[in-house]
């Protein structure tokens, strides 16, 4: 009792807490970090690379990978394999090979069978078959880095690339050499026949793909869904829609007979048939197959299928049907952004309504192209959209509206290709407006005779005040505030290039490092008309004139005697209104 009371006097009494909120106090010690906790999570980087690969933004991938190397010091094989796949997908096999060698060299992160399969596929796509076979030989002989095993997956990657390129000769050679790895119980597998069928279709020999079916049946190989899809595609390429529908019906009958859902037609099957009926302009069959696709519970109609239906409707001349399907796409895309249409679908709709002269519909599609479409809108798509808007206004009889659109096109794009539908619409508009409202008024060279030699109107070369190429830009910078382009000469006085104002970006650099070389040269006997055409076609700011005997076409060894500038050309122009 005395001992207990002594201890109790040393302990400071604590305030009582309610029993429901009592929490025992416990001292916390920092936990020692385990090796697993120190691991770097690179999954977000891999997902980012996969996303950029789909967008074909290889430059952005390289930048982010280099930044990750500086941050983490070392990446793993999974990340670098995704980078290799990005290089192959974007068609840059040289960059893929360089990264592969960095991975395989001593001190690198190493390579595996996936790395080799990706490189083999890339070499096949680039048609560098000899290098691919050399790599396969090193794997076969066991001298390859990482000591991968020769497997069917490596062969299939190269085989698929060869078949996609239509190189069936080398594909058959690959099968003959490595048939032991690819044979299934002594006979070719269904996968091999599917690949060969696809190769024959890609090489414009669809009938040969259909003939392979008989060989499969003789070997007692049962066709799968991919086989039937390839056969249907081959029949459509041959223009035999009846045979395509026969395979389609056989496919459904076998699926019901064997209770095999993997034999049921999928969205690829229906999309292939839709394209076939669209090419054949068979609207009734197209509507039937589209209705069947919508009623099929196991088929999810994706953006590709919807786009194919709209294009097929337009080919059949049913703009109302195409508009209904297009509206359904927009309605479904509100709940599922994956279904948002691509820009080229908007262009297809705009082309159809522009021909009909439905300016209101084309304008609505034009305004919704930017906010409602999915993916990037390229410069070519923007130009065509502007041209279609002008064409629709012209076909609708709204000449003033079409003229305003044409003015905006000229201000924005500076040029109109005459071979396009927009160029033809501009020509029609110019014809209807005449000289009174034309924005493309001709300018005549009334002050000179185009057949005369350029020597008669050129500026003497000394008058252009050329600069020595060894001078630094900071010593002559004020010269480019007054002139857009200046000739550059060497120590012997020969013109070696032209320095433009927009290329002057380093004050401490010599002029020769920034000039454009060689300069465009013409002889003194070249006609004025030919030089004018050259300046306008290539948008040149200056042309160097050399003696006929010294002309070599490059300007490096030619003694310049004169120059002709764009400013001179503008002074020679005279508007047609002054001549009327």
From Swiss-Prot:
Belongs to the PPR family. P subfamily. One of its GO terms (molecular function) is mRNA binding. SUPFAM superfamilies: CBS-domain pair. PPR repeats lie at residues 76-110, 112-142, 151-181, 189-223, 224-254, 266-296, 302-337, 342-376, 382-417. Pfam families: PPR, PPR_2. Disulfide bonds: none annotated. Coiled coil: none annotated. NCBIfam families: PPR. InterPro entries: At5g10690-like, CBS_dom, CBS_dom_sf, Pentatricopeptide_rpt, TPR-like_helical_dom_sf. Keywords: CBS domain, Repeat. This is Pentatricopeptide repeat-containing protein At5g10690. Gene3D superfamilies: CBS-domain, Tetratricopeptide repeat domain. Residues 486-553 form the CBS domain. It comes from the Eukaryota.
């Amino acid at each position: 009792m005395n001992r207990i009371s002594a201890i109790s006097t040393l302990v400071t009494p604590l305030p009582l807490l309610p029993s429901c909120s009592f929490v025992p106090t416990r001292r916390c010690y920092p936990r020692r970090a385990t090796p697993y906790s120190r691991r770097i999570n690179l999954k977000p980087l891999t997902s980012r690379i996969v996303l950029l690969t789909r967008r074909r933004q290889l430059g952005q991938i390289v930048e982010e990978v280099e930044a990750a190397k500086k941050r983490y010091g070392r990446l793993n094989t999974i990340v670098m394999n995704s980078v290799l796949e990005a290089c192959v997908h974007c068609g840059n096999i040289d960059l893929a090979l360089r990264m592969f060698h960095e991975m395989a060299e001593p001190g690198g992160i190493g390579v595996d069978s996936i790395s080799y399969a990706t490189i083999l596929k890339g070499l096949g796509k680039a048609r560098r078959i000899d290098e691919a076979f050399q790599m396969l030989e090193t794997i076969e002989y066991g001298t390859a880095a990482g000591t991968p095993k020769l497997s069917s997956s490596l062969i299939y990657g190269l085989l698929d690339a060869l078949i996609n390129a239509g190189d069936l000769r080398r594909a058959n050679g690959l099968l003959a050499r490595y048939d032991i790895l690819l044979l299934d119980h002594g006979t070719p597998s269904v996968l091999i026949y599917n690949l060969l069928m696809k190769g024959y279709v890609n090489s414009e020999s669809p009938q040969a793909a259909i003939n392979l079916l008989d060989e499969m049946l003789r070997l007692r190989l049962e066709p799968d869904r991919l086989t039937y899809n390839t056969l249907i595609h081959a029949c459509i390429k041959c223009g035999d829609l009846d045979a395509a529908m026969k395979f389609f019906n056989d496919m459904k009958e076998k699926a019901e007979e064997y209770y095999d859902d993997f034999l049921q037609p999928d969205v690829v099957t229906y999309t292939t048939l839709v394209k076939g009926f669209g090419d054949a302009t068979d609207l009734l069959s197209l509507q039937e197959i589209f209705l069947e696709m919508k009623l099929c519970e196991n088929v999810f109609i994706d953006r590709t299928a919807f786009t194919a239906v709209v294009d097929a409707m337009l080919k059949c001349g049913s703009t109302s049907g195409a508009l209904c399907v297009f509206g359904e796409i927009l309605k479904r895309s509100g709940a599922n952004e994956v279904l948002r249409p691509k820009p080229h679908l908007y262009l297809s709709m705009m082309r159809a309504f522009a021909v009909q002269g439905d300016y209101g519909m084309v304008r609505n599609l034009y305004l919704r192209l930017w906010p409602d479409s999915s993916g990037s809108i390229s410069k070519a798509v923007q130009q065509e959209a502007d041209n279609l808007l002008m064409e629709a206004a012209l076909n609708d009889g709204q000449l003033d509206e079409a003229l305003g659109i044409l003015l905006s096109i000229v201000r924005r794009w500076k040029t109109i290709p005459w071979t396009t539908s927009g160029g033809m619409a501009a020509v029609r508009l110019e014809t209807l407006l005449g000289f009174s409202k034309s924005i493309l008024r001709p300018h005549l060279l009334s002050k000179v005779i185009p057949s005369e030699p350029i020597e008669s109107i050129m500026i003497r070369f000394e008058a252009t005040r050329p600069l020595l190429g060894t001078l630094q830009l900071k010593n002559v910078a004020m010269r480019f505030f007054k002139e857009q382009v200046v000739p550059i000469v060497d120590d012997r006085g020969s013109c070696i290039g032209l320095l433009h104002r927009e290329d002057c970006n380093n004050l401490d650099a010599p002029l020769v490092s920034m000039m454009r070389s060689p300069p465009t040269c013409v002889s003194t006997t070249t006609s004025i008309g030919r030089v004018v055409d050259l300046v306008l076609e290539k948008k040149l700011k200056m042309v160097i004139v050399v003696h006929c005997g010294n002309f070599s076409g490059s300007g490096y060894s030619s003694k310049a005697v004169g120059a002709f500038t764009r400013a001179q050309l503008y002074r020679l122009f005279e508007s047609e209104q002054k001549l009327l």
